[in-house]
């Protein structure tokens, strides 16, 4: 594929740009026009810019399995942040000037998706250059979504229910932690429990989704990470799933991470995008996953919702009690109350957003954010400290887990209560270039 290098003869210089910046391309265009290139040529430029950003921001490119030549060119050109921003501006203008795609809805989604990715790229450049951006504005520019706000009173109502469930004299966070300890998976049982759960997640998913016959995954157990689990998609329907063992893993974490990172979560999502869009349509932009982009809201939201889809109603509780509790050699005598607690703790999930919002906006410091998480999310002090590390690295990304799940649930369940219908809408979401705003537009 011929790589088009886009350069307007007169480009507005961004704040970080200087007159000393060298030229950023050999071909000049008087203005970005639709005749300048096909969309595939524009995608080639897009891939080069994202890969160039990855040289400045190590976590920016979450996965890339496209042509190696683009990665080599990004390394060879060594574009500065200002140069990437300039070329992204021209590329956005070119995309906006493309002829109307008429009734081709997929093409419209493709072009809009590229524009949103470029807006997110510009936002990450600004952040890397030291710009201060309000939390909600940042999340909209990166993920095309703004999470709802909740005050302390919202969480206090839920905390009162937990207090009634686990009465005692000690502070509520200490009571919760003491009760939960009996459900920690022993270290020597962790691998067997996780691998059993992941296989069950896979079995249930494959009953509804046709994945490539050669799809596969491997598991690693790691430490010193700010996250609890991670899927590193390798391409060719293969994933490396890492489980962080810094903090204790509870019995419910096995299914949660198995579905989230694997089936029908990240591994499934990436495999379908590769199969349907990269190989099926030749849309090479989907051979690169920019972590800080609207795609992440759908990725994280669908991965979290996928747990409920694969294990509807009480099926998850039954599976864990009948299979994982014995495998972990845990006593299930208090399991019923434990699952009642988990349901209530899930309702505190948005407390993490409030901690991140206040901390990143400078309204509270790290110590205050940690205390908020202990008081209102009922985190252990260790988990609260780990969360601050996550906020430092991933910032407003935190909204993708809970608000993303809510948006995906709304979209999928708008099709009715029939289980198979929900799976079909879920598959549609995972196989298409839908953006977060499409989830509300298409849920009607």
Predicted regions and their residues:
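Bacterial N-terminal signal peptides
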Residues: 5-13
């Amino acid at each position: 594929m011929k790589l088009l290098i886009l350069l307007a003869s007169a480009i507005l210089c961004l704040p970080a740009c200087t007159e000393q910046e060298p030229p950023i391309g050999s071909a000049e265009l008087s203005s970005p026009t639709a005749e300048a290139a096909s969309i595939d040529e524009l995608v080639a430029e897009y891939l080069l810019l994202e890969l160039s950003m990855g040289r400045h921001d190590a976590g920016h490119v979450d996965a890339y399995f496209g042509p190696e030549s683009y990665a080599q060119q990004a390394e060879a050109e060594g574009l500065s942040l200002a140069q990437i921003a300039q070329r992204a501006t021209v590329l956005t203008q070119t995309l906006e000037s493309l002829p109307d795609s008429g009734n081709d809805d997929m093409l419209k989604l493709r072009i809009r998706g590229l524009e949103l990715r470029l807006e997110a790229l510009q936002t990450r450049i600004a952040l890397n250059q030291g710009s201060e951006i309000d939390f909600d504005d940042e999340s909209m520019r990166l993920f095309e979504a703004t999470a709802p706000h909740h005050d302390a009173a919202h969480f206090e109502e839920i905390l009162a229910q937990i207090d009634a469930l686990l009465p005692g004299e000690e502070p509520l966070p200490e009571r919760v932690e003491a009760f939960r300890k009996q459900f920690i998976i022993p270290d020597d049982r962790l691998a067997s429990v996780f691998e059993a759960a992941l296989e069950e997640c896979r079995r249930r998913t494959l009953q509804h989704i046709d994945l490539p016959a050669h799809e596969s995954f491997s598991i690693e157990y790691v430490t010193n990470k700010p996250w609890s689990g991670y899927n590193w998609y390798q391409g060719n329907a293969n994933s490396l799933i890492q489980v962080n063992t810094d903090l204790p893993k509870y019995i419910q974490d096995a299914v949660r991470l198995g579905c989230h990172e694997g089936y029908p979560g990240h591994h499934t999502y990436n495999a379908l995008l590769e199969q349907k869009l990269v190989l099926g349509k030749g849309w090479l932009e989907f051979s690169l996953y920019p972590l800080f982009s609207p795609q992440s809201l759908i990725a994280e939201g669908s991965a979290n919702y996928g747990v409920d889809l694969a294990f509807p109603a009480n099926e998850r509780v039954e599976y864990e009690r009948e299979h994982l509790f014995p495998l972990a050699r845990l006593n299930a005598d208090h399991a019923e109350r434990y699952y009642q607690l988990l349901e209530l703790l899930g309702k505190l999930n948005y407390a993490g957003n409030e901690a991140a919002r206040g901390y990143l906006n400078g309204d509270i410091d790290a110590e205050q954010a940690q205390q908020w998480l202990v008081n209102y999310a009922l985190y252990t002090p260790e988990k609260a400290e780990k969360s601050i590390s996550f906020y430092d690295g991933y910032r407003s990304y935190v909204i993708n887990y809970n608000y993303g799940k809510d948006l995906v649930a709304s979209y999928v369940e708008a099709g009715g209560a029939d289980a198979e219908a929900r799976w079909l809408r879920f598959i549609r979401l995972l196989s298409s270039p839908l953006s977060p705003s499409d989830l509300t537009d298409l849920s009607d």
